[in-house]
């Protein structure tokens, strides 16, 4: 039950009635009409800009049109009054009959309250993490992993058919470096003193088990082979081992994928799909042989003064056409990405979301251009950039990990503070802003720790319900059973504030999904938790506001219905974020 969508329909009906009466012109564009909370809660429960955005085309002054619309809205059931403010803003106050309907919807729909049909089942591919399989996941990967997973959950809750995908970068030079690093550990496992790890190889201890496994399987035989012979075998073993570790790290964060896609699969096997994608674009005129002009200002990384295979990305808004082959004839990374995204289109994904590190920001335009080209303009690619995470402990920067050799691993962070703290705090700031993550602060049991504050609100609600079950043994235990309680008795200012917040959850879900901003969910939950804690604290000072009133069974049942509603929406939002809604704090 989306209150704002319901009243947006009422506004459209009011406008249609005015058209039918010949008061205003027909065929008005209602796309910019919104119904939202007023900036000042004292102005009412809802506000609309309808008159302000329609007045010119309607042929009336904004305030005159506002008064006409207000007159129609005033007859809607559940409306207490409608005011016109300033030049033509419309404020709507709801009466006491409306909020019980909203709360009853929360109680009967449970965790599905707020679930939206916004996506209408549209297929969307969300690709995230896609870390090189060259080492353990680190804290930088962690933020992108949590963001991507929460975004996928949010899109699913908003009605999209979501596929979660991981792109395994197993075809570049970095995996050959991985193989050479693993081979060094193989020699070490055979008893050879390898000394200090040479520059250019991966120094972490995480490849020691790979070397031991190779030694156990092959003995010294690999040492007798040339690099050309041993490298593919060692590379495959190292990648497989790293991907097992990556999957385990992601599982520790509560993250799983529907698809793991190998980059190497694009250029091996019976069909060279990278070459095929290039030739398809050549046939449509979007690939040509030519020379790039010398760079102006800042150097262009992949510029070479030679005849080369180029993609016409400037036709799609990019700054310069992009090379698809290197001077040695091998494909550029961009060419592989074109083929990969073409594969997504071929699988039926016309809506794609990629989650990348902020350092890839310069790559966005060319990739969006490529998606337009390979799909004939049918598909869209949205890219969400993830800023860096700075790790602290009690205000002091955290030093590198011994295991990885150069960074703090994701598993170390999860093991120290727990999955819930990591996930919630990674989502308590917009993804394009840097994040300071303090290992000590995220496990504090205080209101300054957002994850504790929100989880405690859910646990407090459950505690109230347990206490009520002892006081009133004959009251029902299931939330849905409270939908028939005398909910109209919820008329205290704090109770109405909570009801307004619950009513805004469906709208918030659609807004967050539309903007691809799961942090809005964590902000909403923190606000709901704050209002719930505030109402509980008011009851400490004013006994008549307590949730359990021993001598008033009806009022108690109404307030317990509200507690159930708060717990339900908190649990629903936490589920979208992939965070546990705990019943008791430990």
Swiss-Prot record:
It is an enzyme of class 6 (ligase). It comes from the Bacteria. PROSITE patterns: AA_TRNA_LIGASE_I (PS00178). One of its GO terms (biological process) is arginyl-tRNA aminoacylation. Keywords: Aminoacyl-tRNA synthetase, ATP-binding, Cytoplasm, Ligase, Nucleotide-binding, Protein biosynthesis. A motif ('HIGH' region) lies at residues 131-141. Its EC number is 6.1.1.19. The keyword Ligase applies. It is found in: Cytoplasm. SUPFAM superfamilies: Anticodon-binding domain of a subclass of class I aminoacyl-tRNA synthetases, Arginyl-tRNA synthetase (ArgRS), N-terminal 'additional' domain, Nucleotidylyl transferase. GO terms for cellular component: cytoplasm. PANTHER family: ARGININE--TRNA LIGASE, CYTOPLASMIC, ARGINYL-TRNA SYNTHETASE. Belongs to the class-I aminoacyl-tRNA synthetase family. This is Arginine--tRNA ligase. The gene is argS.
């Amino acid at each position: 039950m989306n209150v704002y969508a319901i009243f947006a329909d009422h506004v459209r009906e009011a406008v249609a009635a005015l058209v039918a009466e010949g008061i205003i012109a027909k065929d008005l564009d209602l796309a910019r009409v919104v119904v939202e909370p007023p900036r000042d809660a004292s102005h009412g429960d809802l506000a609309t800009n309808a008159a302000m955005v329609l007045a010119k085309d309607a042929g009336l002054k904004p305030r005159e049109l506002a008064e006409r619309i207000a007159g129609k809205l005033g007859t809607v059931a559940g409306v207490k009054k409608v005011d016109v403010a300033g030049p033509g803003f419309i404020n709507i106050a709801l009466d006491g009959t409306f909020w019980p309907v909203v709360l009853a919807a929360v109680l009967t729909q449970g965790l599905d309250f707020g679930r939206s049909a916004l996506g209408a089942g549209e297929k969307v591919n969300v690709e995230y993490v896609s870390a090189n399989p060259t080492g353990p996941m680190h804290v930088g990967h962690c933020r992108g992993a949590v963001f991507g997973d929460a975004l996928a959950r949010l899109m699913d809750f908003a009605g999209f058919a979501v596929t979660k995908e991981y792109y395994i970068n197993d075809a570049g030079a970095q995996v050959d470096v991985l193989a050479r690093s693993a081979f060094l550990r193989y020699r070490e496992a055979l008893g050879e003193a390898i000394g200090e790890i040479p520059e250019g190889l991966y120094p972490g201890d995480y490849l020691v088990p790979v070397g031991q496994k190779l030694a156990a399987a092959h003995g010294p035989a690999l040492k007798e082979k040339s690099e050309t012979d041993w490298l593919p075998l060692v590379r495959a073993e190292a990648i497989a081992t790293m991907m097992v570790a990556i999957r385990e790290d992601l599982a520790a964060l509560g993250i799983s994928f529907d698809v793991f896609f190998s980059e190497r699969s694009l250029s091996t096997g019976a069909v060279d799909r990278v070459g095929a994608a290039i030739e398809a674009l050549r046939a449509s005129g979007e690939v040509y042989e030519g020379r790039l002009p010398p760079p102006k200002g800042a150097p262009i990384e992949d510029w070479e003064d030679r005849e080369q295979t180029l993609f016409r990305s400037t036709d799609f808004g990019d700054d310069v056409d992009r090379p698809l082959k290197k001077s040695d004839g091998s494909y550029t990374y961009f060419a592989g990405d074109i083929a990969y995204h073409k594969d997504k289109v071929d699988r039926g994904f016309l809506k794609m979301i990629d989650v990348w590190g902020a350092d890839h920001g310069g790559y966005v335009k060319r990739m969006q251009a490529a998606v337009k080209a390979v799909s004939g303009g049918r598909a869209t690619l949205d890219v969400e950039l993830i800023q860096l995470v700075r790790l602290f402990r009690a205000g002091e920067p955290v030093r590198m990990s011994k295991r990885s050799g150069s960074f703090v691993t994701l598993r170390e962070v999860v093991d120290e503070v727990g999955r819930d703290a990591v996930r919630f705090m990674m989502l308590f700031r917009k993804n394009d802003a840097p994040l300071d993550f303090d290992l000590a602060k995220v496990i504090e049991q205080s209101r300054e720790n957002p994850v504790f504050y929100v989880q405690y609100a859910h646990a407090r609600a459950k505690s109230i319900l347990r206490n009520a079950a002892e006081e009133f043994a004959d009251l029902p235990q299931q939330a849905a059973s409270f939908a028939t309680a005398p909910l109209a008795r919820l008329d205290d200012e704090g109770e109405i504030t909570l009801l307004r917040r619950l009513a805004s959850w469906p709208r918030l879900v659609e807004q967050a999904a539309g903007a691809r901003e799961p942090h809005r969910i964590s902000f909403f939950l923190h606000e709901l938790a704050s209002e719930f804690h505030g109402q509980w604290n008011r009851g400490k000072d004013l006994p008549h506001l307590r949730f359990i009133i021993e001598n008033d069974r009806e009022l108690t049942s109404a307030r317990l219905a509200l507690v159930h509603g708060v717990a339900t929406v908190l649990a629903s939002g936490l589920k979208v974020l992939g965070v546990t809604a705990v019943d008791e704090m430990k």
